[in-house]
Amino acid sequence: MINPLTLYDSATETRRKNIYEDVTGDLLGYCVITIKYFYNFDDAYIDLGGSSTRWVSNDPDYRITADMTFVSGHDDHVKVTVRCVPLGEGSSIVKTYTLSVYPDGELKG
């Protein structure tokens, strides 16, 4: 299941980013979230494993980072924080999502 999430700059409304996330893995072992980010037809991928952060972006104007952590006391919930940091002028955009992961690997949120 793929759900669209939207990350946008509310100050200008001109740079709109669509984030799609998909979950694979096993809650008893590991959980991997892949976020696919589109901007100006350039795509980048953020892969999250455990609490580590990895990012790749071919958009020269932004650095995209993301972090995933399991919600304390709830092994079936993850918190994803996505940061969009402009390398020039402008404000950083930070969005946090709490998502539920079910044993079949499907993401709800």
Labelled PLM ranges:
Residues I2-G109:
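Mature secreted bioactive peptide module from preproproteins
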